[in-house]
């Protein structure tokens, strides 16, 4: 009876949480696929909200039908959810499930790169996923994960670096933070230090600055601390974006 009560309470909690986060309007073409799925998927990544993660996965699948031009980016998001499930399985000592989901994630990332025609979107998702989960993979997989993260952030830097000071704080912080973390974890210590200096110069009075100061004081700490996802993955961004679009009519 107690077990059934716990299951009921969990189901009730998930139902209430989902009710507080309205279904993303997939038919609204003013919104990018990233805006439509990011909030639900990161609720899974950062808070283990499996209900919202599942909704994000479902919406990715629906968007593959509705927006075929965004196939590459959507496949990258699918890879991200598979990587989350792989890491969760590893941390629960379910090795068979880990191997299944990890291989699935790698295959989906490969498909995303094969279908990528525009550049940027796939690398943003790829770099972000590995920045969140790279250190949580089994040790033997971490070097490859961070090598891929480094390549993805380098591609983003070529695209966004010239105007990095004009990016929103979240994008600026995640880009520079990802560059610093991936450089350090792939043995590029001097390069990592340059990105830390850029964070200090361009992200004053933000959560990124406080982490970068610690890194500056002791560069070795970059090896085992994270700066990923410090801002703007909270609920409400989708609604805020919709409100802004509707107000601009």
Predicted regions, residues:
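Sequence context of c-type cytochrome heme-c attachment sites
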Residues: 180-181, 185, 200-221
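Conserved alpha-helical positions within TPR/SEL1-like repeat arrays
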Residues: 76, 83, 124-128, 177-178
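Short cysteine/histidine-rich metal-coordination sites, predominantly Zn2+-binding motifs
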Residues: 222, 242-249
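Boundary at the C-terminal end of the N-terminal hydrophobic targeting segment
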Residues: 17-21
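Bacterial N-terminal signal peptides
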Residues: 6-16
């Amino acid at each position: 009876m107690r077990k059934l009560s716990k299951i009921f309470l969990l189901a009730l909690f998930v139902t209430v949480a989902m009710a507080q986060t309205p279904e993303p309007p997939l038919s609204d073409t003013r919104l990018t696929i990233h805006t439509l799925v990011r909030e639900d998927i990161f609720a899974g990544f950062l808070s283990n909200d499996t209900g919202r993660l599942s909704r994000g996965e479902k919406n990715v699948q629906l968007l593959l039908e509705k927006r075929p031009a965004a196939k590459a980016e959507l496949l990258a998001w699918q890879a991200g959810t598979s990587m989350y499930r792989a890491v969760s399985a590893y941390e629960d000592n379910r090795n068979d499930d880990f191997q299944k989901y990890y291989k699935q994630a790698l295959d989906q990332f490969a498909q995303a790169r094969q279908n990528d025609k525009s550049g940027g979107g796939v690398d943003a998702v790829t770099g972000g996923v590995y920045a969140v989960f790279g250190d949580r993979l089994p040790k033997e997989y971490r070097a490859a994960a961070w090598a891929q993260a480094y390549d993805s952030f380098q591609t983003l830097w070529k695209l966004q670096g010239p105007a990095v000071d004009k990016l929103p704080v979240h994008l600026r912080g995640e880009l520079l933070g990802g560059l610093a973390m991936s450089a350090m974890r792939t043995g590029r210590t001097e390069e990592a230090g340059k990105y830390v200096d850029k964070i200090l110069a361009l992200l004053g009075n933000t959560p990124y600055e406080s982490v970068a100061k610690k890194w500056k004081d002791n560069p070795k700490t970059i090896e085992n601390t994270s700066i990923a996802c410090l801002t703007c993955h909270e609920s409400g961004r989708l609604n805020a974006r919709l409100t802004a679009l509707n107000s601009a009519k």
